[in-house]
């Protein structure tokens, strides 16, 4: 897998993935906001960029010095979605987290119920709570 530290990823590559993902989910009106986000923060991210998928991870350290890895985003092209590739990506997340000496690996709340069930069976624990502010 092609692992790239933020600054080395071109905005053209990022823009291509943003357009594809947002088109699939009906979010093309969010393209510019997504581009601005990555332009501002890409130097802090770790990217896995392949022709069939991408992933974005963010290493961080909490106030007690505990290293953590956060899966900010990942996407697999619809015609390439299968359990084998999914497991390969999950394994790579763990490898990268270990290489960065992280104690915890977090994945976001946008994940579907089936994926949450799989992650729970493989050692993940619910770690965050979210409240929508209206």
Segments from the language model and where they lie:
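Short secondary-structure junctions
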Residues: 3-4, 122-127
């Amino acid at each position: 897998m092609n692992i790239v530290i933020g600054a080395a990823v071109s905005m053209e590559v990022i823009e291509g993935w943003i357009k594809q993902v947002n088109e699939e989910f009906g979010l093309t009106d969010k393209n510019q906001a997504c581009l601005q986000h990555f332009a501002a923060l890409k130097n802090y991210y770790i990217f896995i960029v392949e022709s069939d998928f991408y992933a974005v991870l963010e290493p961080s350290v909490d106030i007690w010095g505990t290293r953590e890895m956060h899966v900010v985003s990942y996407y697999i092209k619809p015609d390439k979605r299968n359990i084998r590739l999914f497991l390969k990506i999950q394994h790579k997340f763990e490898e990268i987290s270990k290489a960065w000496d992280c104690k915890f690996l977090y994945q976001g709340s946008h994940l579907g119920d089936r994926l949450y069930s799989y992650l729970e069976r493989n050692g993940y624990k619910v770690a965050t709570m979210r409240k929508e502010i209206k």
